[in-house]
């Protein structure tokens, strides 16, 4: 009996020592960010000064009865659009979101601002956005199951001429992202909710729309004035 107690105590102590001896491993790496395809092509034409106007979420996503009324998706889309417009190399993008901060810094430097006006304003909407979870089961789930998260986004962009308020060019972009994993006979990982899919699919749809804007300039479908 004493021998059994001693063995149990030794085993428990050994497990505790093994657990306490484990150390966490911290890993990090830089992840390459995607740029518009148009950014990889040299452009020698005129760059029109543009600003980004309203960008609203017109989809049903985050607009239910329990919504707080803050358009986070539209705000995120606007930031992404400004970045990709500048990266495309076809435009001189003017920032209108930080006017107070730039005015303050100019005052600190005792400089007078010379704010440049835009020839065009790009407005946009997230017209479609949604997520769904799909899956299948092998032999009624005995042999495993697959769970896949799918996010879809569609955006619309309109280029408005400041002088006349005329919509001179319009494009749409759409994208889909999915995340899946398979669990086989109780082993493996399942696809838990990944909130980053929202940003990834929105970025993809906007990149496609910006590439269409740039392509329109390259083929002469519309000619922005410098």
Per-range role (PLM):
Residues 1-10:
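Bacterial N-terminal signal peptides that target proteins for export
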Residues 49-56, 80-84, 92-94, 119-127, ...:
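Soluble periplasmic/extracytoplasmic beta-strand elements of cell-envelope proteins
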Residues 168-172, 207-208:
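Juxtamembrane/interfacial segments around transmembrane helices
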Residues 23-25, 101-168, 178-181, 187-192:
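Surface-exposed short loop/turn segments
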Residues 16-19:
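Bacterial Sec-type N-terminal signal peptides, specifically the leucine/valine-rich hydrophobic h-region
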Residues 175:
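Active-site donor-binding loop signature of nucleotide-sugar glycosyltransferases
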Residues 22-93, 98-106, 110, 179, ...:
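A structural "domain/chain start" motif
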């Amino acid at each position: 009996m004493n021998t059994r107690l001693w063995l149990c105590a030794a085993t428990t102590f050994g497990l505790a020592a093994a657990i306490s001896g484990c150390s966490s491993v911290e890993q990090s790496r830089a992840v390459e960010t995607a740029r518009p395809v148009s950014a990889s092509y040299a452009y020698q034409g005129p760059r029109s000064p543009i600003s980004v106007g309203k960008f609203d979420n017109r989809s049903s996503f985050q607009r239910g009865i329990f919504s707080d009324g803050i358009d986070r998706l539209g705000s995120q889309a606007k930031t992404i659009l400004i970045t990709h417009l500048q990266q495309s190399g076809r435009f001189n993008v003017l920032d209108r979101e930080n006017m107070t901060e730039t005015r303050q810094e100019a005052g600190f430097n005792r400089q007078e601002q010379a704010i440049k006006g835009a020839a065009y304003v790009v407005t946009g909407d997230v017209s479609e956005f949604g997520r769904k979870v799909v899956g299948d089961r092998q032999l009624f789930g005995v042999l495993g199951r697959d769970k896949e998260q799918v996010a879809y986004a569609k955006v619309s962009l309109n280029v408005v001429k400041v002088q006349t308020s005329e919509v001179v060019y319009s494009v749409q972009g759409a994208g889909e992202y999915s995340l899946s994993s398979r669990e086989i006979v109780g082993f493996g990982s399942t696809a838990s909710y990944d909130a980053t899919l929202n940003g990834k699919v929105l970025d993809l749809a906007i990149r496609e729309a910006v590439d269409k804007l740039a392509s329109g300039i390259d083929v002469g479908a519309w000619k922005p004035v410098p």
